[in-house]
Amino acid sequence: MLTDTTRSPYAKVHALDGMKVKWTGGLWKERFDTCANSTVPQLKHMFDSKDISHVVENFKICAGDAEGDFDGTVFGDGDFYKWMESAIYTAYQTDNQLLKKEIENYIDLIGRAQQPDGYLSTKQIIGERTGNGVSRMGDINDFEVYNFGHMFTAACVHKRITGKNNFLTIAAKTADYLEHLYEEAERTGEVQTAVCPSHYMGLVEMYRTTGDKRYLKLARQAIALRDSVKNGMDDNQDKIPLKQHEKILGHAVRANYLYAGVADLCLEEEDPDYMEVLHKVWRSLVDKKLYITGGCGALYNGASPYGYFFDHQLVHQAYGYEYQLPNITAYNETCASLGGVFWAYRMFQLEPKAEYFDILERMMLNTNLAALSLDGKRFFYENMLRRAKELDYKLIWPLTRSEYILSYCCPPNLARTIAQSSEYAYLTSDNSVWTGMYGASEAQVKLENGGEFTLVQSTDYPFDGTIRFTAKDVKINAPVHLRLRVPGWSAGGSIKGAGADRELTKEDAGTYLDILVEDPQNMDVQLSLDMKVRYTVANNMVEETVGQAAIERGPLVYCCESVDTHAADLDDVYLDLNAEFTPVEFEIQGRRMMALETEEYTIDRSEFDRNALYQPLKYHGMSRKHVRLIPYYAWDNRDYGEMRIWFPVAYTV
């Protein structure tokens, strides 16, 4: 499983083993199948290719299977370990015998590439041999410890799913190397904060997998050493001591990984100060810096909003000021919202509040799924909320998805998360089953009282709000509590079955219903959520969206592409608050989804100079034209064109 908190003393709920939960239909089944059949093989080809990524070739050079120099990115090792996770999950979920064998071959290669002292970073190993001046731990931007962290996590996943120790043994040797490194850092006071601290989560998972308390101590030590960094910066969240953190800032991936790691530590050790930090920074994100799509990190490159003239204040791929949420230039790195998922998931296990899964689901169904093309072969590194026909400036990344870019961290991170997505469906505590992300599924549940049954969820969510729960293969003679999440966006609905029949109220939104099922053998509980189309407006401090609204239905954010309207330009479309939306089944590239058909106002801008900075206002009236909205996750899978989520509202008196 992704995180094994079954023995974590401060976990209120625990994840089900991912191999015991399977999507059986609907959107998540389709996305998992696409990941297994298309994305994982595509990424394998990229990593195997000497000419594209050079990643596997670097391991071969370290192992003595090939000759040559290091090539590719410094974080390629870690990205490959992330792909290994996706491969392990999909191979064993689908019983892919060939992929299982290839995984073991890769593990053998990784083991032979490792140095006798446990060190394993291909750039440095090759550099030591060629004498090109590259040194171990000489530059935090070489991502060595980031690579270690993803190795730790992949090795734990491999052990839990296969029962084999070969990958875990390699990871343990590297953890031993890291232990000596931190002991030396404490002795000398020479401390650097590792960028993108995946190793916090990785080390805690090593402890959970092996029971060796050295790894938990090492995670605590690694986090505490942040406070000893000299010349820290907001970009790396180490300018001030961790326990003084109140705002989310700096590089968004690094921030979300940091707080996910701290949450992992808090699941194992009580620390009220760290919990206070987690609460403050979470509120900073959710209340003032999170995009409607669940995207994290508004800025490309710039200066920290909280920096001073003489401070280290450069930031990149970062959170900005409160309410600084541009649309065309929204950065929203895919790895950042994935990190937000990891963080929210751990926070939920600390305190099972519906908000954490509301945010997790928003990130997963909108930004994260949008980062992958419907055919599973092309990726967004950054996730804009608006695309214009053309820009007068050049952004770092392409405005459409790419099969491969040099900075390839997001695709394997996305692949492993989709491969593991069924783990976000259910959690358990005592004699309770808690729902996380909804989707048609079957879960083999074993409760702490020894009771076992298969929980069957039947639904077309997120396109339909009716969710039915039944049970089969029941081996329990005691009541079961079904804890059902009512998302914060659901203003109504109903619950039926188990003697709990009633209409839902506004007070139920954003809470868990506790449904006592006295006879699990005859379980039949139906939750119906309000799926009315919603107009959503932002705080007026979000300057780019003043006077505008977005359209949501259920957990999905909707957008419009230029191909789906007869307007000359998407900027000409204004929302009519009296317009009716008709949900209709729609397909793009053979993938089924629910679109919204409507008529909206379009303004006549025939005399408008779209190249002028300023010009006299000319109004020639409005007309009504057909508009189709599609789920944001499905955009950029047809012809290139405009896209936008936020539209000006045509208020009437």
Give the role of each language-model region.
Residues 1-653:
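Glycan-recognition and catalytic cores of secretory/periplasmic carbohydrate-active enzymes
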